[in-house]
Amino acid sequence: MAQPMRFMLNHIETESYGAFTPQNLSPLINRAIPHTRAQISGSPVVAVGRGSSGRTFFGVNVELPGLPLDHSIHAEQFLLANLALHFEQKLECIAISTNGYYFQEPCGHCCQLLHKIRDMSDTKILLTNPTGQKGTYMNLSTFLPQGLISQANVPRLLERNFNCIELINHSLYMDICSYSEHCNHLNCRALKAATISYAPDSKCPSGVALIDHRGKVYSGGYMESVAHNTSLGPVQAALVDFVANGDGQEFKNIVEAVLVEKKCGVLSQEATARMILEKIADPDCIFRVLHCK
């Protein structure tokens, strides 16, 4: 396993790398490639994005051992979940590469998810010709299906969101902290992740919290995209936190997990979450579901 890396650069570090060009991004891509987890396909992908705050964020593709590739985390999805972890609400430009010199457009799945960010159609996508010698910029709208129009009155991905949910078992609130994003309690972190998750179509918010063998907690919330393609499930969102902040650990070091979701929603994450964790986590990993309404 590669040495741990930081998946976010502050604005001062970002400025030191200069303009968002292939030449300046190449060393960043090459730094991130060893942190991709593409054991099945052998095809690493890195996404680099620059936020409106001036910070730089990384995303890498993550394939889950023993599971079909449709459960994988795309580099662009990882990037968006990483933005959410750092409360970044706007992506100014994005670059995607497999080797540090050829830059390509986002895949069709991820174009749909990227479009969920407000004003994302104007975000610049860095592209190069096959030789990687010349960089050009194209708007994300170029790659979106015709007729896909954002609804102005619908909440957008990465915007501050608060789902009005409460745990059905009220006795659990005795153990819920006021500032759960900074605590190390699984129930708190999973509830917080569900509260700020993005599910405007299904109205089924959900969140997952994981704990490793050292006692460190990671969390993530559902990111929904039903226009044409797939969403990012809460387990995968929590795994982004694990990969980005888990010091390069293997998934087998995950020893407990909590899912918070609606009791009688139109969809459930429980079966998928259980299947993923049974495959990748510690064989004795404890998995609990807390229902909300």
From Swiss-Prot:
It catalyses: cytidine + H2O + H(+) = uridine + NH4(+); 2'-deoxycytidine + H2O + H(+) = 2'-deoxyuridine + NH4(+). Binds 1 zinc ion per subunit. Zn(2+) binds at H74, C107, C110. Residues 20-151, 181-293 form the CMP/dCMP-type deaminase domain. GO terms for biological process: cytidine deamination. Its EC number is 3.5.4.5. GO terms for cellular component: cytoplasm. Keywords: Hydrolase, Metal-binding, Zinc. Gene3D superfamilies: Cytidine Deaminase, domain 2. GO terms for molecular function: cytidine deaminase activity; identical protein binding; zinc ion binding. Belongs to the cytidine and deoxycytidylate deaminase family. Homodimer. This is Cytidine deaminase 8.
